[in-house]
């Protein structure tokens, strides 16, 4: 195992004093979770975009994100079944929560929400969407499967997949800290980052909660 501060077999420095941080030259360590200091440096350099953000949101190895006031709910009374390849236009209904009021998420219910913050990632960085421990202990899950934000993600909000697995309703307050993002470096910049012309990137620049676009996939 390489010692701290000594070159590895790839020619990059191992973690230790003098580490430049992501995207800063030959000493960059790839494949690591970013610390608070590295997150701040990327924000200052403009390579990582989180807007708006306050310094208190930056945790030791993540950034807290807040819940926006918009939700997408399923219109169960008009839809009998969901076909991912043939999504009806009236499957979802948009709900805007007034300032000072909460959205009530009932047991077993699933809705789409959004972050307050818009996120932008460089081509050599991915983000993971994670819940908050204190909310998880209340039975709130913030994503079903979509916990991965691709490298090159253009500036846009993150859609949250909110579900209540508890036995009591949960109040969701706009502006509350709903989750956190951790950031991971790639071993090399992505050759075809999100939004590349050769990819079927369906959520470029999303604003507010965005319903499933699975029907746009080829069968």
Region spans (language model):
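DUTPase catalytic domain/fold
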Residues: 27-219
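Detector for the Zn2+-coordinating histidines of canonical Cys2His2
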Residues: 3
């Amino acid at each position: 195992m390489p010692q701290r501060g000594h070159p590895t077999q790839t020619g990059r420095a191992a973690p230790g004093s003098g580490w430049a941080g992501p995207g800063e030259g030959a000493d960059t360590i790839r494949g690591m979770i970013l610390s608070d200091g590295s997150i701040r440096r990327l924000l200052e350099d403009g390579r990582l975009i989180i807007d708006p953000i306050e310094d208190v949101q930056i945790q030791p190895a993540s950034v807290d994100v807040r819940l926006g006031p918009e939700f997408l709910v399923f219109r169960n009374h008009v839809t009998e079944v969901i076909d991912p390849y043939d999504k009806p236009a009236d499957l979802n209904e948009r709900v805007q929560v007034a300032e000072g009021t909460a959205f009530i998420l009932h047991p077993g219910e699933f809705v789409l929400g959004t972050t307050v913050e818009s996120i932008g990632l460089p081509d050599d960085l991915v983000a993971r969407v994670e819940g908050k421990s204190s909310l998880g202990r209340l039975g709130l899950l913030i994503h079903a499967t979509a916990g991965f934000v691709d490298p090159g993600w253009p500036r846009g909000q993150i859609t949250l997949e909110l579900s209540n697995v508890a036995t009591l309703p949960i109040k969701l307050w706009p502006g509350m800290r709903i989750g956190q993002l951790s950031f991971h470096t790639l071993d090399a910049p992505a050759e075809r980052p999100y939004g590349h012309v050769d990819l079927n990137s369906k959520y470029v620049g999303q604003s507010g909660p965005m319903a499933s676009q699975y029907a746009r996939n080829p069968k």
